[in-house]
Every structure is written in C-alpha cells, then in structure tokens.
Design a protein with these regions (language model features):
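Short polar/charged helix/loop
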Residues: 2-215
Length: 215
C-alpha cells in the first residue's frame, strides 16, 4: 500500500512544508486519531482507502477537506487513497474556495459552468485532478460502500445519524468560514481555515508515513 512520495506542484509543496503540526492541540489529535486508525487498518490489510468528506451543503469545508486529504496522501506517499465529498444537500462549491486553493498553489480549471460549476483541481503535474462540484453524500459520483464518512460540520453530523455503506463514521468538524462572507476578513479567514484543514490532514497521513518509515 505504500509508495514513494508524489512530486506536488511547487507552491503546494511550499505550503505544506510551512505547516506547523505543533498548532494542533492534544484534544484535537484525539479527534483525528480514529481517522488515523481507519487509514492504518486499510494499509495493513492492503485495501483501498476511501474517504467521503461531508458537510451540509458541500460548498466549503468538505471541499477543502477532500482536496487536502487527497493531496496529503500523495505528499506522504500513501497510495490507493480516493477522496470524495458530499453534503446533505447539493448547492455549489463556493467561489472563494477555488480562489483560496489557487492562492495556495493548486491549478484550477472550470470545466463546466452554471449554477453548480465543475472544477478540475490539480495538485501534481502527473496525477489525475480532483473533480470538485457540489453533490449529496450518496450521489452516484461517490462510493456506495467500503468508505469512511468524515463529518466536517456539526449540522451534518447531527443531521446524518446513518450513512448507508459507510464502514466508519468519524466526526472531524471545522468552523465555517461562511460567517466571514461579505466582510473585510473573508480572504484571511478562508485561508486560515484552509491551512487548518491542510495541517490536520497532513498530520493524519504523516502518522501513517512515520509508522512505515517514509521520509
């Protein structure tokens, strides 16, 4: 299940290398531990690792979490990782998410416009791009079984007591940057939330890499 690290786009590499794991509290590490354990069990059993990152509208936090989890897996050399996202309802990926990721080094191309645009999000020159658009967590685009459901907001956690097909349900909630929309702090707070999610997803995959001695 382990492979060599992927070469990411240079600005993303720079962003990741500047992350500070010491900013993660011990309490927060306990929240992340079930995800570490899920990934570890899949690696040990030579199984594919499927993560479905879920929030209410699949518009902000779930997209950031999907993108950074997939990127972290590549950076730390954990193969056969497939990350998805969804919501309890479909809306659209909020434009500030694309702008934030673009600023942090991702290449983003709009491949379909409309009320629910579809984006191709590249983190490495030779890897398939992440396809970003809003959908429900049980959309046909997402896996039907053998996945972990990662709840990235408390309302989705409370509103989805049962997620069909999920092997494991793991709440890892983040504060919504939406509260800063239409304020002078919007750009700063979206970047801040993205960096928090990047830090925590990279920490999770770094634990797997550490166990297997990947440098």
């Amino acid at each position: 299940m382990i492979t060599t690290k992927k070469t990411l786009l240079s600005e993303i590499e720079k962003t990741i290398k500047e992350l500070n794991f010491e900013s993660i509290t011990e309490e927060r590490k306990l929240i992340l531990q079930p995800l570490v354990a899920f990934i570890q069990s899949k690696v040990e059993n030579h199984q594919e690792i499927r993560l479905n990152l879920i929030c209410t509208h699949n518009s902000r936090r779930s997209h950031l979490s999907q993108v950074w989890a997939q990127t972290a897996a590549a950076f730390y050399g954990i193969k056969n990782v497939f990350c998805y996202s969804g919501g309890t309802e479909a809306t659209a990926m909020f434009p500030m998410i694309a702008k934030t990721l673009l600023k942090q080094g991702f290449q983003i191309k709009t491949i379909a416009k409309g009320t629910n645009p579809i984006y191709a999000i590249k983190y490495a020159e030779n890897e398939y791009p992440i396809i970003g658009f809003s959908k429900t967590f049980d959309d046909s685009f997402n896996p039907k079984s053998e996945f972990a459901a990662i709840l990235t907001c408390s309302s989705a956690d409370q509103g989805c007591p049962y997620i069909a097909g999920a092997e494991k349900r793991i709440p890892i909630t983040f504060e919504d940057p939406k509260v800063f929309d239409n304020t002078t702090q919007q750009v700063e707070k979206y970047e801040e939330r993205s960096i928090q999610i990047a830090t925590e997803m990279c920490f999770v995959f770094s634990q797997i890499a550490l166990y297997y001695g990947i440098k």
